[in-house]
Amino acid sequence: HYDVIVVGVGILGLAHAWHAARMGYKVLMLDTTASAQGASVRNFGFVTVTGQRPGEDLPMAVRSAAIWKEVSEVVGISIEQTGAWFVAHSAASEAVLKAYLKESSMTGCCLLGPEDWKQQPVGPFLGEIQAILHSPHELRINPREGIPKLLQWLCEHAGVHFEPSAHVQTVGDGWVQTPGACYQADHVFLCLGDRLQALLPEVWRAFDLRRCMLQMLRLEPIGVRLDHPMLTDL
């Protein structure tokens, strides 16, 4: 019997396991593979604070960034980049950046002028620019390295038990059934991403969930190392 069962070893599952283990709970993680294979390791690894809505979203993003800093120190995950440039190529995007800067409660953000970005090594590659908003609050990790490293640390140092190759067939109140065993816990968290559609199709339909895709393109290196990520309009 466990205190917590987490199904899925992507970032959402790892986050639940991290907090549960830090609170002293006995944690079991289950997944069909030995490490995350989906969006957790295919995405950019941004921890984005700037632009979040005030209310619940912004404090949550600020707290998430603080937690990631703690995780990076404890686990030994490198923070690849800090801060961010939000680049506006159109007048409409420039207006959005200025409106955000005027209305946001976040401190430390500022608009950069041509004299600022043209001195940067990447300046010649940016094309025609209207404005750039600089934020010091963002973080970026390498998810292909950081996600497996966090799982390994949880198993080796936080007492988390991990069962790979565990295909969850059915779930109920306080239990999870796989072909080889039935596991019980006080709390069960399903962090399956779009695999939830196969396990609990009625839940998927009830919330009218839809699968989405993100298109990414890896470029040939241009010989420039950026201190911070850049996010641009089209």
Predicted feature residues:
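Glycine-rich FAD pyrophosphate-binding loop
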Residues: A21-V41
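Helical element adjacent to the flavin cofactor pocket in flavoenzyme catalytic cores
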Residues: L133-P179, Y183-H187
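Short loop/edge segments at beta-strand edges and connector loops
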Residues: D31, Q81, G113-E115, F162-A166, ...
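Dinucleotide-binding Rossmann-like beta1-alpha1 core, especially the glycine-rich loop
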Residues: F44-Q120, I129
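Hydrophobic anchor at the start of a short beta-strand
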Residues: V27, C109, V188
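Glycine-rich, N-terminal phosphate-binding loop of Rossmann-like dinucleotide-binding domains
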Residues: V9, G51, H89, L192-G193
